[in-house]
C-alpha cells in the first residue's frame, strides 16, 4: 500500500480555476491521496464547489473557516492532514498527472524528508520540461543553504514528510516570504532531500502580477525573514561567505523589485534598503562573488539612480 499523501489547497476567490485544480489532483497516478480543501471564507461559489467535490469523492475533506489568508488556511490544513507526507497546491494552479507519483517515488527511494520538482509558469509559455535529472542532498549544511538562499522557496513544488514538519507552521503575520521561512524551518529537520528538474507543476501567473501588487510591507517582510535566517544558529553555521552571499542576493532582489514597482520612490524605504546593502557590502565583497555582482552591489549601495531609472523603463 502506498504511503498516504495529504494535499492541502487553500481556496479563496478561485472559482474560475478550482475544478481544474481539483481534477488534476484527484486524477493523479499516485494511488493513496487525501485532498484537503480549505475554504478561507471565500465570498464566491468556492465554498459550495468544495462541498460538491467532497460529496463526489471520498478522498476530499473540506474545512470552512473565516478569511485570514493563505498561511492560516495552510495551517488549518496541516492540523487536519493525516498523511505521512504532505504537499501543497494553490487553487489557481494544476499539476501533471504523474507529479505526486514522481515526487513520492523519489522521496521513498532516497529516504528523503523533502522531494521537489520544477514548474511551468503561465507567463512563460515557451518553457519546455527538463529531462528529469535527480539531485539528492544529504549534507546538513547543503540542505539548509538550499532553503536559506530563497531561490527554491515555493512549497507547492514539493512534498514533505509529516515527521519533518512536526509542529512547524506558516507565519500568519507575513504577507510574503512565508514559504521561504517555512522551508527554512523544515530544512532543519530534513536529513535527505531529493529534487528532479522535471517540470510537473503549472503555476498560473495572475494578470495583476506580484510585481504590480508589491508594497513596502511585502519587501520589508522578505528582508525581515532574511535577517532572521542569517542571524539564526543554523544560518550562522553556513559560514561567513555563504551567509554574506545569501544576504546580498536577497537584498539586491528586493532592491530590484522596489525599483520595478516604484516603491523606491518612498524616501524612507530607499534609505532603509540602501542602509542594509551598505551594511552588508564589506562582507559580500570578500565572499568570492563574481566581479559583475560586486559592481552591481556597489551601484545599489552608492549610485542607486544609475540602476533605478533604467529598471523602471523595463
Language model region names:
Residues 17-19, 44-52, 94, 98:
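Acidic helix N-cap motif at the loop->helix transition within catalytic regions
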Residues 65-81:
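Glycine-rich, basic loop-to-helix element that forms the pyrophosphate-binding segment
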Residues 86:
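Short aromatic/hydrophobic "clamp" motif used to bind/position activated sugar donors
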Residues 24, 31, 39-48, 68, ...:
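A conserved acidic beta->alpha catalytic loop
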Residues 191, 199-206, 212-238, 252-280:
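Catalytic core of nucleotide-sugar-dependent glycosyltransferases
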Residues 70, 91-194, 201-218, 234:
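Donor-binding/catalytic cores of nucleotide-activated saccharide
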